[in-house]
Structures are given as C-alpha cells and as structure tokens.
Amino acid sequence: MAKVLVLYYSSYGHVETMAQQVAEGAKSVPGVEVTLKRVPETIPADQAKAIGIKTDQAAPVATVDELADYDAILFGTPTRFGNMAGQMRTFLDQTGGLWMKGALVGKIGSVFASTGTQHGGQETTITSFHTTLLHHGMVIVGVPYACSGLVNMNEITGGTPYGATTLAGADGSRQPSANELDIARYQGKHVAELAVKLAS
C-alpha cells in the first residue's frame, strides 16, 4: 500500500479547495492510502481574524516528523512574491533532522499553487519550491501534457507542467475553475500511480 500525503497551506480557501481535489485524484488509484493535512498557521489568531484568514479548515495540522512516513507528498501553497508562503517555508525549515537522516530520499515530491493574478508567479513559486525538495533527494513530479487541461485556450486558467495552479483574483473572489480542479485531480492521480510503482 503506497502512502500519499497532500500537505498544504491556505489563507482564504483556494489552496484548500485545490488540495481536496488533489486528494480525490490520488484516492482514485487502487492501492493508495491518502492523507490530507495542513501546516500550522503562523499569524496570531487576532490578526488572522482581522484580515479574513480562513481558520476553520477541517484538515488536521501535520507534524514535521511524519513526512518520513509517506511514499509521496504533494505540497500546496499560495504564492508570496513568486515564492511559497511563509507558513510553508517555516514548516519546511524545520525538516533539517529529516535531511540529516536522508528520510525523504527517493520519495516523490510534487507542488501545486495559487496566485492572485494571471501572471502572479505560479511557475516560479513551484520551481523555487522544487529546490527544497531536491535538497531532500525527492523525485520531482509535475503534470505532463497528457493532461488536456494544460492546453485549454478557451478561458483564463491556471495549470502548468510544473503543477496544478489556480487564480484567486486580486481580492480573492475568484474560486478555482472546473478546468483547474480537473488538473488538480489529474496531478493527484498521476503522483499516486507513480507512488504505487515506486512502492512495489
């Protein structure tokens, strides 16, 4: 049984929605156990409430040490100036002990993201995230062009060969589109299929 973790940070629910669909895609693969978790919020509760952070998310909070228990991890993050969110960075900066033990070497790592605007740094967020995963010796997996949603030219949409993405809009009012959610499910399924092969 291959074990897959979908681990995310979401400020306003967009990445949470994407993470749920990534998990659904992974669950569609036989022989896979899927866990959905989030990283801790680092903004003080009163400040988070004041700026509308979505704190009522059902996914439990992950611990750093449990990352070693999985065969594949799909990481989800909003972008912050072309990089991962600080909450995800803070979590990953605590993985030095895992790095020392080589605990993540050979495991699959994959990334999906959200930006406020069409050109808001989706691809750089994902590719800069890959640097951390490569330092851990993880095997990077994206979304191949076998996923038809990547070539959808009929609408403004997220989705890259580096990973699924969504556009939240500058005010956060835009929700993930059907095409973006399809790509998210594809990514989860694709990673899970590869995890089964590696685990066997």
UniProtKB/Swiss-Prot annotation:
Top-level division of the source organism's lineage: Bacteria
Keyword Ribonucleoprotein part of the UniProt annotation: no
Residue numbers binding substrate: W99
Cofactor: FMN
Protein residues bound to NAD(+): Y12
Cofactor remark: Binds 1 FMN per monomer.
E.C. designation(s): 1.6.5.2
Domain Flavodoxin-like: 4-191
Residues reported to bind FMN: 10-15, 79-81, 114-120, 135
GO molecular function, one term: FMN binding
GO cellular component term of the entry, any: membrane
Stated family: Belongs to the WrbA family.
PANTHER family, A to Z: FLAVODOXIN-RELATED PROTEIN WRBA-RELATED, FLAVOPROTEIN-LIKE PROTEIN YCP4-RELATED
Protein name: NAD(P)H dehydrogenase (quinone)
The organism of origin for this protein: Burkholderia multivorans (strain ATCC 17616 / 249)
